UniProtKB/Swiss-Prot annotation:
Intracellular or extracellular location(s): Mitochondrion
Function in brief: Interacts genetically with prohibitins and thus may be involved in the mitochondrial lipid metabolism.
GO annotation, cellular component aspect: mitochondrion
Family under the similarity heading: Belongs to the TRAFAC class YlqF/YawG GTPase family. GEP3 subfamily.
Name of this protein: Genetic interactor of prohibitins 3, mitochondrial
Sample GO molecular function, one term: GTP binding
Keyword Transit peptide carried by entry: yes
UniProt keyword list: Mitochondrion, Transit peptide
């Protein structure tokens, strides 16, 4: 933690010489008032409204004025001492964060993405690392490159588990057993270091705290729950920000600051909290926290794909906030699993949530869909009709009768801006996962009969995958594991349980043979993963009860 007593001692004017020693309370970047084009810039006032105030307090007051978090004039007059200056400094945030957090006004280009190697520059070799992955979007966000590194001691932490399971019993007991066997079977990683948690529901937080070691780094993609986890730990264990100098010395808050933890705990936590936002890449620098007797480092998020689409480009701002704000997730869907029915048609009838994707079932199939993505759903005669309706919604400025169903911007105005994916054959239920968006459960009903492959059309640059329904998979696997005293694996070995999808040409008619061809290409260097390669595809899909999940293959 910055030693504010030292920073403010003898200061006659509030200037860059002081503010450079202060980090943005939101993104942890060092603050500066010299160059608006550089990170950490804050806006200085043009004039001083009250000459009675000391210059340094005036500047502090103005710095916060535009951010709607200034102290009242009475508070400053009654307490014009070092404590007031300290409190003000601790709340300072840069202009970029102020605009984004308080006015929802931000340019995605000001939130640049980082690579894994960029972030690992913050992490010394041999360090303890928690690889943070949102379980709700498993296996997306899981990075084998992190888990396989020999120069790091890595534990897998699965966040947002409350969006998958009804209660924490499965999270505590069943997930670690399943994941140990999944990692061994799928990635050849022998590790029993897995935790499933929910920071919002306080599931497994005490167990997590007891497990993680001193000087641990939280590593993962943007918006996977790192900062939310830190804030839960700060509240539970009276944690706070610290600053560690080049010699390794920990500079903790002053006694005055710590006293506020008891006199005004709400304000204390507000000052110490990690910056949580629906905006990706908000954190720009490493920030250390003292949590109980341990040091924990919050790292900026990293991206694994250079071709990844920024969701701000195609998706409406209000819809995007709903997608990203974890606390808005409605858990009644987990408990009730209310479904919508849809029959596949010869015209290519489709199901969509906001135009973010279009699911096209095969003709004659009867389907049930359980939606775990916020926003109302809508069915259309075909994709072209859906795109046409949403184009009209965008041009009508909200007056179109179907505007409430539109979650995309006018930039996605043609079918050519979507990629067509074929879903490999399945029987029963699957979950379709869209990265940074959420998932839906798709179930075919009635007696099994192959009628064709399901398709999903998604804007270019959005990553998608499928999995067997996760909660049922783990629950049934655990029961099998217990009944056989551990002789049977809780993670199936007879079939893949996750898969990437297969991109199809828009005019491809024989999607099943096209899927097999792509499958053989993808597994060319992974021959051990191949299954049913000698079977005729159309004979194979007649016997899915015995030959489950043909052509399923996940590309890490």
């Amino acid at each position: 933690m910055l030693n504010l007593c030292h920073a403010l001692r003898g200061v006659r004017q509030f200037s860059c010489s002081v503010i450079v020693k202060v980090k943005c309370a939101s993104c942890s970047i060092k603050l500066q008032d010299q160059d608006p084009s550089k990170p950490g810039y804050y806006t200085k006032p043009k004039s001083l409204p009250d000459s009675k105030l000391n210059p340094d307090l005036q500047d502090l007051k103005y710095l916060l004025f535009s951010q709607d978090i200034q102290l009242s004039k009475q508070a400053i007059q009654n307490d014009p001492d070092l404590k007031t200056k300290r409190d003000l400094l601790l709340r300072v945030i840069c202009k970029r964060c102020s605009n984004a957090l308080h006015h929802n006004n931000y340019n995605p280009e000001e939130f640049p993405e980082s690579t894994l190697n960029d972030i690992l520059n913050y992490v010394p070799r041999g360090s303890n690392v928690m690889h943070i992955v949102p379980f709700v979007e498993f296996p997306l966000h899981l990075d084998p490159n992190v888990l396989k590194r020999n120069d790091l001691d890595t534990t897998l932490v699965l966040t947002k588990s409350d969006q998958v399971f009804k209660d924490k019993n499965a999270v505590s007991k069943k997930v670690p057993i399943f994941m140990k066997q999944f990692l061994k079977n799928t990635l050849r990683i022998d590790s029993n270091k897995t935790f499933a948690i929910s920071a919002l529901k306080n599931w497994n937080i005490s167990m997590f705290y007891n497990y993680f070691k001193n000087y641990t780094y939280l590593l993962g993609n943007p918006n996977v729950g790192k900062s939310t986890l830190i804030n839960t730990l700060l509240q539970k264990y009276l944690g706070y920000k610290v600053k560690i100098d080049s010699t390794g010395k920990i500079n903790s808050p002053s006694e005055e600051v710590m006293q506020e933890a008891f006199t005004n705990p709400k304000n204390f936590f507000k000052i110490q909290a990690a910056g949580v936002s629906h905006i990706p890449n908000l954190t720009r620098s490493v920030q250390a926290y003292q949590v109980g007797g341990k040091i924990l480092f919050d790292l900026p998020g990293y991206s694994t794909s250079t071709s990844r689409l920024r969701l701000e480009e195609p998706i409406d701002e209000r819809w995007l906030q709903r997608l990203r704000k974890t606390d808005l997730f409605n858990r009644k869907h987990i408990k009730q699993k209310t479904y919508e029915s849809m029959k596949g048609t010869s015209q290519g009838g489709c199901y969509t949530v906001g135009g973010i994707f279009y699911l096209v079932p095969p003709k004659g199939s009867i389907n049930q869909i359980v939606k775990y993505i916020p926003g109302p759903s809508k069915t259309f005669k075909n994709i072209e009709k859906g795109i046409d309706v949403f184009n009209s919604c965008n041009s009508s400025s909200g007056t179109h009768p179907l505007s409430r169903y539109c979650g995309i911007k006018s930039v996605i105005c043609e079918k050519s801006q979507y990629k067509r994916y074929a879903i490999p054959p399945f029987i029963g239920s699957i979950e379709i996962v869209l990265k940074d968006i959420g998932y839906i459960l798709l179930r075919t009903t009635g007696r099994y009969e192959f009628k064709g492959l399901h398709e999903i059309w998604i804007p270019r640059g959005i990553q998608v995958g499928i999995r067997e329904p996760l909660e049922n998979l783990i629950e049934s696997g655990y029961q099998r594991y217990i009944e056989t005293n551990g002789k049977e694996s809780s993670c199936p070995r007879d079939r893949p349980i996750i898969s990437s999808l297969y991109e199809m040409a828009p005019d491809e008619a024989d999607t099943l043979n096209a899927v097999k061809k792509s499958y053989l290409e993808k597994t060319e260097k992974d021959l051990s993963a191949r299954r049913f390669v000698d079977d005729d595809p159309y004979d194979l899909v007649q016997h899915l009860e015995k030959k489950k999940n043909p052509y399923w293959y996940y590309q890490w």
